[in-house]
């Protein structure tokens, strides 16, 4: 459950280390984002010589949440920390590597590039 002002780790090699959610996309009254939802983020911490800089405003897709994700078969999956992957304007990942596991729900939302780059899909 990601809302405005939520800090997230960045799970790719785009150069950002930590981002803050500044908007949940998908309707003017929408308050929360879950796994697979696109949000607008501000880069709060970045590494030198990365593709994104501190202060950049980018789109990102949520790939891990501390709030559990319930599935059709009754199982639930949750993570220790919230994480996102930075996207470009075509909703493709800026980075070329994904760190850590991602959830299967991204496949239904057509983030195939992230699924293929991820080391583990849960």
From Swiss-Prot:
Native species: Ruegeria sp. (strain TM1040)
Alphabetical UniProt keywords: Ribonucleoprotein, Ribosomal protein, RNA-binding, rRNA-binding
NCBIfam families, per database record: rplN_bact
Gene3D superfamilies found in the cross-reference section: Ribosomal protein L14
SMART domains for the chain: Ribosomal_L14
Reported function: Binds to 23S rRNA. Forms part of two intersubunit bridges in the 70S ribosome.
Similarity field: Belongs to the universal ribosomal protein uL14 family.
One GO process term, biological-process aspect: translation
GO CC terms of this entry: cytosolic large ribosomal subunit
PROSITE patterns: RIBOSOMAL_L14 (PS00049)
Assembly behavior: Part of the 50S ribosomal subunit. Forms a cluster with proteins L3 and L19. In the 70S ribosome, L14 and L19 interact and together make contacts with the 16S rRNA in bridges B5 and B8.
A molecular-function term among this protein's GO annotations: structural constituent of ribosome
Highest classification ranks of the organism: Bacteria, Pseudomonadati, Pseudomonadota, Alphaproteobacteria, Rhodobacterales
Record protein name field: Large ribosomal subunit protein uL14
InterPro entries: Ribosomal_uL14, Ribosomal_uL14_bac-type, Ribosomal_uL14_CS, Ribosomal_uL14_sf
Name of the encoding gene: rplN
């Amino acid at each position: 459950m990601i809302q405005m002002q939520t800090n997230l780790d960045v799970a790719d090699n785009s150069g950002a280390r930590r981002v803050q959610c500044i908007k949940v996309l998908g309707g003017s009254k929408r308050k929360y984002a879950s796994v697979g939802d696109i949000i607008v983020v501000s880069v709060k911490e970045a590494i030198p010589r990365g593709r994104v800089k501190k202060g950049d405003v980018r789109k990102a897709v949520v790939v891990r949440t501390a709030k559990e994700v319930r599935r059709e078969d009754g199982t639930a999956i949750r993570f220790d920390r919230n994480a996102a992957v930075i996207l470009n304007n075509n909703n493709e990942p800026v980075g070329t590597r994904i760190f850590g596991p991602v959830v299967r729900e991204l496949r239904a939302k057509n983030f195939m590039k992230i699924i293929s780059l991820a080391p583990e899909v849960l």
